[in-house]
Amino acid sequence: MKKNAFLLVLFMTLISCGRGYHELPFGGMNGKVEKVTEYHIMPGIWFAGFKGTDVMYMNATAYDINGNEICSAVMDSIGRIQAEAENFFENDVCVRSTQRAGGRTLAQINFKERKGNELVYDKIAGSQITRMIVKETSFLRIFKSTVSEDGEKKMKKIIRINRHGYPVSVDVYDLKAATSSHEQNTFDENNNLIEKYIVRKDATGEETLEIVYVQYVEFDEQGNWTEACTYNKNKLPVEVIRREIEYWH
């Protein structure tokens, strides 16, 4: 995993660990979800009727009884783990997160203390320990977070949410690499994502646009979708996503 990409993963984890902006419990799904497994499937084979033999890769996410994301993993088509993150919570505050890939630990972040609107962490990567600070500010439904490493600002994120708590826009800036991304989300009346616009800017200022449309096909008795198809900006199918959802009893 590239260093900047890994820092972004850590950044997302740190933001979710803070007390300012919180992702919705259970990933915004209905009910007390314990685990979700997503199967990403090639649409051509799926639509042809050959279901079950066409998985490209899989994602799995587990939640504790309070809805905190305690584990997530990316797997290949037969379920072998390629990368994973494990989070530990105390009183709904993330105190430790470990990132692994290829069977080895890439880094671990440990919560040290809170100083006003700053969260202080130690990042351990191999024999190197880096002091990371997350500074949070908020106004109405806008949440801003900045991550610094040993005093140098690395990443910045701005999230705008709707009245239900879902992110309608997300801006991420890699301050060292001079790259950024802007994401605009549209939700239906049941708060399911139906359109996503992403503009990415590289260090030269060149922009690329990605548009994703989502069509939902099946839902379970809790009202959570279990099958969906995504389309690109040309309205061509990209993948089918099938979800298996397990609930706490």
Predicted features by range, described:
Residues 17-249:
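Buried hydrophobic residues that stabilize the cores of well-folded domains
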Residues 4-14:
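Sec-dependent N-terminal signal peptides
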